[in-house]
C-alpha cells in the first residue's frame, strides 16, 4: 500500500497542484493539519476543498492555525479522524488535532490532556489486546516529545509528553505529525515508525509503503522524506 504523507499546507493549494499527477499512484493520503495560513484562517477552506479534489481517500486532522470548529468542516468532507476511528484496507486510523499551548497567537492551541484525549477516545473503542494496535495509524499534528520530530531551532523539544506516552504504550504502526516545520524527520519509538514530513507550503512531504494484511502483520516497509522541484 503506497501512502502519501502531507502536512502544514498553510493555505497554499498550488503545492497540491504540483503533486497532483504523482498522487494518482498512491492508495491514500495522510494530512497532518494546518490547512490555514498562519495569520489568515480564511485560507483553510480553499485548501481543504483542493485537498478533497486531490485524492478520493484522505485522512486528516486540524492544526493549531485552524479554527477549533474547523474540524467539523473537515468532517463534512469525510476525512477527519480526530477523536474517532476510520478504517481502510485493514488499517485503523485515528488522530489528534491542534497544537500545544505555546504562544497563544494561534486559534487551536490545546492542553496536553486535550491533545491526547482525542486518542484516548479511540482506546475506548478498540479492542484492548497487544496485537490489536499493529494496524493503527495515528495522525497527530503535535509531535511526540523528545523525538527528532519536535525540535525547534534552539534545540528545545516542544512536543507532547502525553502523546509520546500513548505511542510507547500502544505501539501504533505509523505516527504522522507536523507543526514543527524545521523538524522534518523520520524516527521510531519502539516498533512505531514516526514521521514529520515538514511543511508542504515549503515544498516538503513524505512517502511510505505499508505491507501486510490478510492475516499477516502490518509493517512500514519503506519511508522517505521528499522535496518538491
Model-derived segments and their meaning:
Residues 1-4, 85-95, 131-137, 188-193, ...:
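Beta-strand-turn-beta hairpins that frame and shape the catalytic cleft
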Residues 5-7, 29-34, 58-64, 80-82, ...:
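Active-site neighborhood of phospho(di)ester-bond hydrolases with catalytic His/Asp-centered motifs
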Residues 6, 11-88:
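Core catalytic region of metal-dependent phosphoesterases/phosphodiesterases
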Residues 10-15, 36-41, 64-71, 101-105, ...:
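Active-site environment of divalent metal-dependent phosphoester hydrolases
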Residues 11, 66-162:
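Conserved catalytic scaffold of divalent metal-dependent phosphoesterases
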Residues 49-53, 59, 146, 151-213:
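Conserved beta-sheet core of the metallophosphoesterase superfamily
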Residues 132, 151-152, 214-229:
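A short C-terminal boundary segment appended to hydrolase-like catalytic domains
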